[in-house]
Structures are given as structure tokens and as C-alpha cells.
């Protein structure tokens, strides 16, 4: 059963009446451009056909009752009182979004009953948290008929995750969940929020292979990577690493390396990765899948060697996928790192070959069974 149907059904069972409306917000996969978003750089993700559905109805008071179907837990809070953190981690994503919506729209106090469910695998690097934030943001916007654009809802989601949940994420995940387009990857300039849609080439599929090694950004190494990037930006005297050209980096690389080896390696990844994203857009537009595959491979190598966020299981998955796909297409780790998924752009006629190569080898080598998802690029958050 799809999340949209499950949310509607479980809402009725839980609350004893039918939901008025349902919102769906997709997860995302990032084709190329990793950890560049919080460096004001470029990313090239697409929204995917897995996501979070929220069924909801207005109440005649200011209380939100939120039923999390997948874990059978409920949270309740009053919009007419200051919103405090909950002991349930999932509930803080909801509370955080509502809190920061109220900062922008102080008159918003509309109560509601909500039931939500997701088919985005948790801790997979496919943005289950952004899908949750954007679905809640859109729900609040509809409930209060609030004058918020989709980009504003995305930035509120990011704010909630940064300040209320405590994960120092960039804005890519939320922007993609809010602004995704059917059959398109979207290059996002994470500073200007300008979007360049580019069609997924005909005859190619997006395969996502989950290593089933879980990652946890809040307690992981994500925040230290961010600090190392900020150190490097300060070294170059710029607002963010996006402002450093490859030539400027080369000029002072030895000096930075002598001062802070880790900051040097992190900056090397970010600056080269921004360049790869810009070249990837050109490659896609030219339907040059050999070039795109090379850029994806370069991105993975840089994440492994310079940003140091891959793990052996992920590196092995990427090696298997690259062998199976060949030159026309590519594979790389996607998401924050330390587990999660790889993304592949694969010719349709090689999808089953890829699936078989992975199935025959990955579990044998690692002792972990992978999960294989074929995805389509889809629209961002919408009412159903």
C-alpha cells in the first residue's frame, strides 16, 4: 500500500473520522554534489517516488495531535503555547517546523489532527527527515492558508533541523523535496536558490542501492566536516568555499595543508566537487553519459580520499556497480556518508545485470543484504 493510502486509512482508524486532505513530500537522491550545499555550492539531486504522506484535518482549537503510523507513537502540543522539545526524536522535526513557521507567521495557531507514514528507508541518506519536514511545512501552510513559498517552507525545514533537532544540514534535501520536478534532475545553486532542471536521459534508470549500514548525522562526523570547511573558508578569507576557484585553491594549497591537513583535504573535495557538478549539468544536457560516469567516479574517489566519509561496504558496492554498468553511466555514494546508499545512472538494458552482480557478491563479501530500489524523478511536495 502506498503511503498516501496508508495515511488516509490509519487516520480514520486512529481518530475515528476521515481526514480532510493529504500531503505527499518526496525523499531525494543526489546524483552529484556532496556536502557542497552548506558551503553555498552546487548540487544536482532529484526528488524520488518514495516519501512521506500526511493526512490531516482541522480541529476547532490550537492543539496538534500527530500520529506516527510507522512506530505507533503520538505527540501532542498546543500552538498557543511556546513549543518545547519532545523526548521523542521524530516529534522534534514536527515541532521544530511548526515553531519556525510561527516565527514567520505569528498568527498561525490552527489546531489539527495528523497521521503520517513514510516509505523512505530511515538512515539511508535518502532524506527521510527532509520529507517529514516539508510534508509538515506544507500541511501547516494549507491549514493556515499561509503566504509561504515552497522555497520558504524548505528553508524553515532546514532551520528546524539545524536549531531544533541539532543536525547541521545544508538546504539541498529540503529544497529538493519542495521543488522537485517530474523526470528532471535539478541543479540547485545553494546560495541564490536558483534551479536549473535537466531531463533524465531517455533510456536510463536511477537505481539506488542501500548498503543497509545505518548512519546517524546528529551524532556522526558531519558536524566536524562542517567545521573543517569553515576553517578553510576563513583561511581563504571568503564567506564560503564556493567562493574559492580551483586556481586560487592550487595557489595556496601547500600553505593550507601545512596549517591544517584536514581542512586542506576537505576544501580540496568541496572545490573540486562544485566544478564536477557544473560539468555534470553540461554532460547531461549533451547526453554525454561517459563523461557523467567519469564525474560520478571522481566524486566518489574524492569523498573516499579527501572528505573521508565512505566506508568499505559502500566502496565495494560502488566498485561492483561500476563494473556492471560499464562506461555509459555511473555510480557513487550519495548522502551524508558513513553508510547509506549508492546512486547509479544505468542504461535500462543493464538494470537486471546490475541487480544480479550486486546480489551475487555484496552479501557474500560483507555479511549484509543490500536493498535495491529503482526510482523515478518526481514532483516535489503536493496535495493529493
Swiss-Prot record:
GO terms for molecular function: ATP binding; galactokinase activity; magnesium ion binding. InterPro entries: Galactokinase, Galactokinase_bac, Galactokinase_CS, GalKase_N, GHMP_kinase_C_dom, GHMP_kinase_C_sf, GHMP_kinase_N_dom, GHMP_knse_ATP-bd_CS. It is found in: Cytoplasm. Pathway: Carbohydrate metabolism; galactose metabolism. It comes from the Bacteria. Its EC number is 2.7.1.6. Keywords: ATP-binding, Carbohydrate metabolism, Cytoplasm, Galactose metabolism, Kinase, Magnesium, Metal-binding, Nucleotide-binding, Transferase. Belongs to the GHMP kinase family. GalK subfamily. Catalyzes the transfer of the gamma-phosphate of ATP to D-galactose to form alpha-D-galactose-1-phosphate (Gal-1-P). This is Galactokinase. It comes from Actinobacillus pleuropneumoniae serotype 3 (strain JL03).
